[in-house]
C-alpha cells in the first residue's frame, strides 16, 4: 500500500499538521516538530504531545506514515568542532522530540564539508553524529536524504549514502529518503521508465532497498545534472509525469511515506489524487 502526502504546516500546534494532511486526503505527511530555522525550541508539553497523538489517531496516521524533518541549520559533518557539537546537540534534541511524539523516523540532510575537510572525513563525521544520536535515543530511525549537491553539500551520490550507512553501528536504525528532484539534479535520470529502472537498479546495488524509508516526490525546475535544488509541481518540471507514475506502480515503494514538497500547496490535494489514481494501472514488477 502506498502512503501518499505532503509536507504540511504545523503552525498553531503540531496536531494541526495531521488535520491539514487529512484535509487534502493524504495518507502520509511530513512536518517540522519545531521551527526549522532556529536552533532552540521550547520543550514539548504534555498537552502538545497528547493533542498530536490524538489527532494522528483520529485521522488514522501511524508512525510509518509520518516523516518528520529536522532543522535546516544542522550540519552533522561540520568541519569545525564547536559547530559540529552544536549540530549534534540539536539533532539529538530533534530525535528526542520524535521519540516523545511516538514518531519512528527523522529525515535530515546529511551535511556539508564547507571546502575545509575532505569528503571522506565529512562522511565519517556524519556517521559518527548519527551513532551519537542513536546511542542517546530509542525507537527513532535516522533517515538520510539525498541532496542535489549544491555548494559543498554531500549526499548527492548514492555512494555517499552507502558510506554513511557503512559507518553507522546500528544498521536497524538508519535509512534513506530519496528526493526525486535532488536525484535528477545530481545526475540520476528519471525522465523515462527505462531511466527510472536504471537509476533504482543503481540504488539497489549501491545502497539497497531495505534502507529506503521514505521519498520526496518533486518535479524539478532545475535541469538534469545541474546540482541545483529547485522543486516544481508534478509534471510541470524537467522530470515529467512518467517517473511518478512508475513509482506509483512499483511495489518496492509500498509502506513508506511518499511526500510532496512541490511548490504549490493549493494543488497538493489534486497531486495526491493523481498519484493515487496511477496505482490502478498495470503494476511494474
Curated annotation (Swiss-Prot):
Keyword Metal-binding included in the entry's annotation: yes
Binding annotation for Zn(2+) 3: 182, 229, 231
Gene: nfo
Top-level taxonomy: Bacteria, Pseudomonadati, Pseudomonadota, Gammaproteobacteria, Enterobacterales
Binding locations of Zn(2+) 1: 69, 109, 145
Leader sequence residues: none
Catalysed transformations (reactions): Endonucleolytic cleavage to 5'-phosphooligonucleotide end-products
EC top class named in words: hydrolase
Identification of the protein by name: Probable endonuclease 4
Any one biological process term the GO annotation gives: base-excision repair
Binding sites annotated in the UniProt record for Zn(2+) 2: 145, 179, 216, 261
